[in-house]
A protein has these predicted regions:
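Residues lining hydrophobic/aromatic ligand-binding pockets adjacent to catalytic sites
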Residues: 1-267
Length: 267
C-alpha cells in the first residue's frame, strides 16, 4: 500500500475495534491492544465513534495519539447528548463538557468533529443557527473544525447550505447509503462518509467504483466539485482543501480493505 504523508486526503473507517476484522483485516493472533497501532499503519485516519455514546478518558485520547503515526488524523464524533435534543440551542453545556473531556489530548492529530443528527431531526433555521453558534473555533490552543451530519430531506435547501457556509462548518457528504446527499462544499475541508460496501466484493466496492471515489477525493482536494455529486446550491470557487473520506456501514467487514484500496489509488 502506498502511503503519502503529504497528502491532503485522509481515508479511513469508523472505529478500530470490531470482532469480524480479527483474522481478516488484523492478523490472526494480534493482541487487541495492538489493533489501533496496526490500523494506524494501514489507514490515514479513523473516525472515533465511542465519543458519540459517552465520554472517554483524557489518558485514552493521549494513548491513541501515541499509538498512531505522526501524520495520522482522527475525526471525532460529537456526543449524542448535544445533537439528540428537541431544542438545539440548549446544547451548550454538553458541547462544553465534550471539549473538557480530554479530546484535545489528541493534539495535532485532532481532525474534524462530526456532529451527527438523528434521521428524524428536521431543519429549523433559527434553532440550527443557534447550535452552530455554540461550536467553538478553538480549544486548548487547537483550532477546531466542525462537520454536521444531517440525515433528513428537509435540510436539502439553499438556506441550510448558506447557513453552514456562513459558519464555516462542513456538511457531511453521504453517499451509497439511505441518507440524502448534500454535495455542496461549505467549509475549508470536505468530510464524506460512503456506505456501499458489499460482501460479494473482496475490496468492498467494485474496482471501477473505488477509482471513481479516488477521483472525487482528488477533485475535492484541488478545490473542485465532482460533477456527479448532488448539489443544492451553486458551487463556490475554492483553493486546495483537506478531504476526509470514511468507509462506513455497508458490509463492515470489507471496510478496511476498501479504505486501503482508496489510499492506494489516491497515491
Amino acid at each position: 500500500m502506498t502511503r503519502n504523508a503529504q497528502s491532503r486526503i485522509r481515508v479511513g473507517v469508523g472505529g478500530w475495534t470490531y470482532e469480524p476484522w480479527r483474522g481478516a483485516f488484523y492478523p490472526a493472533g494480534l493482541p487487541h491492544a495492538k489493533e489501533l497501532e496496526y490500523a494506524g499503519a494501514k489507514l490515514t485516519s479513523i473516525e472515533i465513534n465511542g465519543t458519540y455514546y459517552g465520554s472517554q478518558k483524557p489518558e485514552s485520547f493521549a494513548r491513541w495519539h501515541d499509538e498512531t503515526p505522526k501524520d495520522f488524523v482522527f475525526a471525532v464524533k460529537g456526543p449524542r447528548f448535544a445533537t439528540n435534543r428537541r431544542i438545539l440551542a440548549e446544547a451548550g453545556p454538553s458541547i462544553e463538557r465534550f471539549f473538557r473531556s480530554g479530546v484535545t489530548q489528541l493534539k495535532a492529530k485532532l481532525g474534524p468533529v462530526n456532529w451527527q443528527f438523528a434521521t428524524s431531526k428536521r431543519f429549523d433555521p433559527g434553532d440550527f443557527a443557534a447550535f452552530l453558534k455554540l461550536l467553538p473555533s478553538s480549544a486548548d490552543g487547537l483550532a477546531i473544525r466542525h462537520a454536521v451530519e444531517v440525515r433528513h430531506d428537509s435540510f436539502r435547501t439553499a438556506e441550510f447550505v448558506a447557513l453552514a457556509r456562513a459558519y464555516g462548518v462542513a456538511v457531511v457528504i453521504a453517499a451509497d447509503g439511505p441518507y440524502p446527499q448534500i454535495g455542496d462544499v461549505t467549509a475549508s475541508f470536505v468530510y464524506s462518509r460512503i456506505m456501499g460496501t458489499t460482501e460479494g466484493e473482496d475490496l468492498g466496492y467494485p474496482s471501477q467504483a473505488l477509482s471513481q471515489w479516488a477521483e472525487r477525493a482528488k477533485t475535492w482536494a484541488k478545490g473542485g466539485v465532482p460533477s456527479d455529486v448532488k448539489l443544492v446550491g451553486t458551487p463556490e470557487a475554492a483553493k486546495d482543501r483537506d478531504v476526509f473520506l470514511y468507509v462506513i456501514s455497508g458490509f463492515k467487514q470489507r471496510n478496511p480493505a476498501a479504505a486501503m484500496a482508496l489510499i492506494e489509488r489516491i497515491g
